[in-house]
């Protein structure tokens, strides 16, 4: 997974040739930490088809604010330089993440 910051967000997400999943998380977010190993497994499964990336909001608040992330966990799904889907809070399940990744293909 690619760690995103304000310096590389545009290049890695908006300008990506591949569809992109962006995982907004925080070290004190229990649900975020619980999902992390499964998201890493998905990243391996979809390697070469979908780019998986993450934003630690504790270290990159500006990125979270710019993307209007209001709670954690939040997953954004980008394709062709635009956000096409978003799931956050209690709506975030591994199944929902997988559904949205499949929709990017």
Regions found by a protein language model. Give the residues of each.
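Thiol-based oxidoreductase modules, predominantly thioredoxin-like and allied folds used
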Residues: 3-4, 24, 36-43, 47-62
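Structural micro-motif
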Residues: 61, 67-76
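Short pre-active-site segment immediately N-terminal to redox-active cysteine/selenocysteine motifs
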Residues: 17-18, 25-28, 71
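Non-catalytic, surface beta->alpha helical segment in thiol-disulfide oxidoreductase systems
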Residues: 76-105
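A short beta-strand-turn-helix
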Residues: 2-20
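Short, thiol/selenol-centered motifs that function as redox-active sites or metal-ligating centers
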Residues: 28-35
């Amino acid at each position: 997974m690619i760690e995103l910051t304000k310096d590389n967000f545009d290049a890695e997400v908006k300008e990506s040739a591949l569809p992109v999943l962006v995982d907004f998380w925080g070290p004190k977010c229990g649900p975020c930490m619980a999902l992390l190993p499964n998201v890493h497994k998905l990243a391996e499964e979809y390697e070469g088809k979908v780019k998986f990336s993450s934003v630690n909001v504790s270290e990159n608040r500006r990125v979270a604010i710019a993307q209007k992330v209001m709670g954690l966990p939040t997953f954004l799904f980008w394709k062709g330089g635009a956000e096409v889907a978003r799931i956050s809070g209690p709506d975030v399940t591994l199944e929902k993440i997988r559904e949205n990744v499949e929709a990017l293909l």
